[in-house]
Amino acid sequence: MLDDGSDLDRAREVARDADQVVVVVGYTYEDEGEYLISTENIKKSAEAGRLIGEKGTGGDREDLSLVKADRELIHALAGTNENLVVVYVGGSGIDMSDWDDKVPAILFAWYAGMEGGTALARVLYGDVNPSGKLPFAMAQDAADYPYFTPYTDNITYDYYHGYTLFDKNNIEVAYPFGFGMSYTSFGYDNLQVLTPQLDPDGTLLVEVDVSNVGDVAGEEVVQMYVGFANSAIDRPVKLLRAFEKVALQPGETRTVSLEVPVEELAWYNPEAREWQTETMSYAVYVGGSSAERDLLTGGFAVQ
């Protein structure tokens, strides 16, 4: 049964009697269109060989939360059915702090295109085991983000942003960068740094055992971060420097290899006008997200 959710009392009644409930909320191009120019002006720009600008349709969101009607619908349906999932349609992170602990499941569908409905159904019915990971961190509270306003004409993005800013300020987030769940679970063990001593022109080699400890076949994105705690300059706590996706059957364990050239750990020295590699001890973190609770830890040195 399809219901638009505008009548909250009716929506509750429908949800209580249903076998499963799918609550679709989120945004459209009118909310996140970034002032897209019209098709007509796209054609004119192509013919003229230059961009013909206009304000266009849609812009930036005015709030980090869902719109009021969506939030009210979620709160109204929370607790009505144990088989309820909130499906979020949108292109960026949202503040879910007032409702995420009140619903059994949340699925980010993003802007999935013409076959998005088919893809969503396949995930919900278990034909596909989701394996996506968040490309950003989501804070516990909107106040944890830098100052936000959709009305400014210009804005400055500092060196630290995203998960590196949260790490630097020691702020625990609600959903870390690289986080993502599936219908199974994965375990990490036996982290080995195969190149504990490296020259600046060397390559860091790491291996880790990854196991599917659930009952369903699935895919996991194994992530490797490098830490810079011993740096003589101001650097992030850690940065993602390699990742690998591995498919595992229930009970299966595989050894996953990750590598990163040392030159990719360099920093740009504006005074010398060159990239430089620090000779020091580095940390290695490997796991299923950027959250330190999910990471195995090792180390290596560049001489």
Predicted features along the sequence, with ranges:
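C-terminal non-catalytic regions of proteins with extracellular/luminal or membrane-system context
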Residues: 1-303
